Amino acid sequence: MKVALSIPHTEKIEKFMFAKKVIRQKENGEFQPIHRAGLLNLADYEIVEQYNAEARGLCNYYNLACDYHTLDYFCYLMEYSCLKTIANKHKTSIRKIIRQYKDGKTWSVPYETKTGTKRVRPVKIADCKRGEASDIIYQRKKFSWKTTIRQRLNARVCELCGCKEADLI
């Protein structure tokens, strides 16, 4: 007698995606990715990080399932919902966003660090299986500020006392 762990698509995965407003169901029963209005005020790389964190969480949770490869469709829906969110933010099409952020065969969003420019790309199911998609780099806290940390540091104003042009760390 064999015991197999399978992924509960309808009970858990679809409920998760409807709760997060990642997809909607068409009249013919197919799923269509939609943009998430709650993420429009974030920077592009933060939007990708948010989607990656959610996708990695589910992929890691169901990592031992025998039908793990079926999560590929889930990752596809998450990626295109992410693209639709970024496209909606910039009031453009998905095709233009992919062209703008093209990086080889896939797309990735650049962001600045102290050591230079890095890129964040959407997570794929193969990354989760190999363990490459761990949360080591992207440990950001969730804030609802309209400005990014880069904009606040470039303003050269101390957020604590309000003095200007001081050497800020």
What are these regions (language model features)?
Residues 1-169:
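Non-catalytic terminal/accessory segments
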